[in-house]
Amino acid sequence: MAHDVVIIGTGPAGVSAAWPLVQAGFDVLLVDASIGSPTPPPEGEYLDLRRRDTNQQDWMFGNDMAAWIDRAATSPKLRVPTLRAVFEGFAEANRIETDNFAAIGSLASGGLSNAWGCGVARYDRDEMAAFPFAHADLDASFAAVSRRIGLSGRAEDALGDYFGLDEWAGAGPPLDENAAGLIRRYEARRSHKALQGLRLGRARLALLSSNLGQRQSCDLSGLCLWGCRRGALYSAAQELPELEKAGARMRTGVVVDHIEKLEAGWRVHGVERSTGAPTVIEARRVVLAAGTLATTAIAWRSLRHYEKSGRVLSNPTAAFLLLRAALPGRAPVPGPAFAQLSFAHRFASGELAHGALFSPGHLPAFEFIKHIPTSRSAARLIWRLLGSSTLVGNAFLPAKLAHHRAILSRDGVLRITGQSGDELTRSIDALARVWRSAARALGFLVMPGSFAMGQLGSDIHYAGTLPMRAEPDIGETDCFGELAGMPGVFIADAATFPELSAKPHTLTMMAMADRLGRHLAGVSRP
């Protein structure tokens, strides 16, 4: 049986493309590679569980202590036992190999939205100048997606216009004392010379501050890293039951390899993940939304795009610690574990850096202790004294500062090589100087040695491999994401982005996927 549309991937892009089609009455099949059920997050409040839960090692480290042992993982979320099924097996299943680059993806239902930071923003006109459609073409889709998933963080601050989302966002949850003190001083001293060019405000998040459908608002449990039992943090997996009720079909456990042209549609070739047995699915149209890297591997294999080097966009990262010097040694208190504040800085070159500030009090202490350059016992003491007076910062830099390449070998393996140069180092050093000066003006210090560059690819913001063009060549996409050389195959994820801003891109990707779904629903009837 040939479906009207098969969507490969059930992450944010896949479900956003699906909704307009399902609502229009199309026969839509969503396919992902998930097997089994996800491990539920712990129940309770983080600090209370740390004091009282006699089985906390199970969710902190895992039965095999993998969270403690796996020091190679680029992010704390990759070591969380309850999230192991989100990440495991991705590169192997999709035949992806890397050199100097972290290729992270998900085979789980909901994809990487099971473990993302929930940061959202709307790309502005300048950031979308290279996209071959009008910025206003996304207006209806931004509104629909934002209302569907629920946003918070609305504030009259320096970042309202920058994020462009406050008409759809609710108020944000309360800030902890460190974040509240930092933003209060910033608002009082915005004219200070050290703060010129640095914009600071509330983080805008796909987080509920009031109930939405079956999802409950945030209760500040502090367990965000492990997953949210209340559904306050958005995951595309939350939408799958509603899509099925509306008429969509689901097929799980299938890893897609390539697509073959038929006389009147397409045949999707894959393997059953649990058995390795080959399987096929037929459809009039196919939408690839498996995440940029997996989507690229599928598309390039289908196009026989062998031994041709292509770019991979990704945001270089850096991390740092801010210390509030006036309040060392406070006892930790319950509070938020998600990003509380965001910042934006534009370099003299005009390029943008974006970042967020978190409380470390609801993250495993060993994630910080291991970076303190002293003995383990001394590091624990230092962190016990200072940890409750710190904020953790992460920063995303322009994708143009890195030069990653991908190539598909004739045996179908996608190989990605990470590359960067002195320009990236200089930009990180420049941002570090900005923050050191700004922190002093705000009553904080950047802890010495803490402004460190992350592994290339560890941002997990991959894009640009199948870029949109006004007149696409083979292997590029048109203004709706249709893949040149494969009419009837569409790309819904960030592989279509011709450029990648440092600003969070997921909501823009979802709006583009919604626009694609509306387009497909309008050009043919079921």
Show the residue positions of the predicted features.
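Mid-to-C-terminal "cap/lid" subdomains and adjacent gly/pro-rich loops that border
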Residues: I35, Y46-R84, R284-V392, P526
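Core beta-strand elements of the Rossmann-like FAD/NAD(P) dinucleotide-binding domain
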Residues: A2-H3, G276-R285, A289
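Conserved beta-strand-loop-beta-strand element in the redox core of flavoprotein oxidoreductases
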Residues: H258-V280
